[in-house]
């Protein structure tokens, strides 16, 4: 494949063009008056979204170089999403503003390496300042505010997530399900989550989100390594006859047995997923027993005289729903309260009896997993399209809330970044010189971009609003929904400090990379051959082969 090689200014300009396209399509969703974006889907109804990272993932451009620019800025959004679960639009807008400002300086002859050093030092200073200004989240009112803002100013969702956190604790598991009705409701049921994901990505049922969701599955729990597929065949046949999915939780599954499961899954013979058992050694056995109690099944263990090839359906556990990602497995069980309570009592007694603080800690963890249960939010909506949008918003809200509990909250709506700009300016003037100072000033000018965009989406003049906010105290910002200046904490317009910090760090990282780019190598597009006349006669020419 021949390559195109582009140097210097041309390379950076082409990247910038791709970034402009992506940043604009994501920025329209920012703030309470942000608009929606409609995504065309190959199959099914179009999807209406208000979520930065989902939009960013959809954008592919024809020009390979511009597409590289899109991919770079998309990384800022998805890294922020991985770290904090929200703030993707802010990260995109910040990265774009920093790149724009930085390219101007590079074109004027500034040294990109010195600029990058300045950008990194400024970011480090801002991260410390954000931590200083963050307030811890104590009560459920603050949790509700964070969740409501993140779900697109939906107070009902905010209250629901605050309730869920009250019921399952701050470390508890909150899972989302699609409801059969139009209302969104909360339910707390028995369940647990452990830190092991699927053994093979081929088990994923939703390839876009890379997760396996199995409804009403059987659960096979065993402490042995499954090496031969023959051991599994009898139980697989029984499950296939019952017509339900199967989740296997085992110490490990060797290649041959795993390949058989994957092939059956892909051919649609049996909806199956396999997960490695959590923990190690004796602790692993104890956790497998917890899972068996939760799902009303048995651990098929050789030391209990049970063999895998002799297993019967009634030895398997049952769950309402199991969701498996690459790192976690969440089991939602039901109707087995008595056995779970008895098991919890047993663990409590062990905690009282043990002297080792390490064992105590591990037992506490097991108890929390079992006793905490799982809060299930059933997302309801009138149409499929609205349901998907609500589900994405709720997911953002849950992530934002967990981030807020971790690192505290700061004034939202782009306010924190705008108020930190003068502080950064003063610090940089004292501590930095030359081109490093210019690098810090690039960051300082970019800090007002999110607020400016929020104001513009609300139909106001962004530059004027930014200047007015700068004159006010730290906690006071612009409420775009009501078009007034308010104390952001009192008005409940708050962002998790972790989200603001991650957005800033990832934006600065991408900006530094783009500014220090001197050359781009991309594939040369192949010239399209014209079909000779008469080809495909009698066939529709529009088929994809």
UniProtKB/Swiss-Prot annotation:
Residues 525-545 are annotated as: Disordered. This is Chaperonin GroEL 1. It is an enzyme of class 5 (isomerase). Together with its co-chaperonin GroES, plays an essential role in assisting protein folding. The GroEL-GroES system forms a nano-cage that allows encapsulation of the non-native substrate proteins and provides a physical environment optimized to promote and accelerate protein folding. One of its GO terms (cellular component) is cytoplasm. ATP binds at residues 29-32, 86-90, 413, 479-481, 495. Forms a cylinder of 14 subunits composed of two heptameric rings stacked back-to-back. Interacts with the co-chaperonin GroES. It catalyses: ATP + H2O + a folded polypeptide = ADP + phosphate + an unfolded polypeptide. One of its GO terms (biological process) is protein refolding. Residues 535-545 have a biased composition (Gly residues). CDD domains: GroEL (cd03344). One of its GO terms (molecular function) is isomerase activity. It is found in: Cytoplasm. Pfam families: Cpn60_TCP1. Its EC number is 5.6.1.7. Belongs to the chaperonin (HSP60) family. Keywords: ATP-binding, Chaperone, Cytoplasm, Isomerase, Nucleotide-binding.
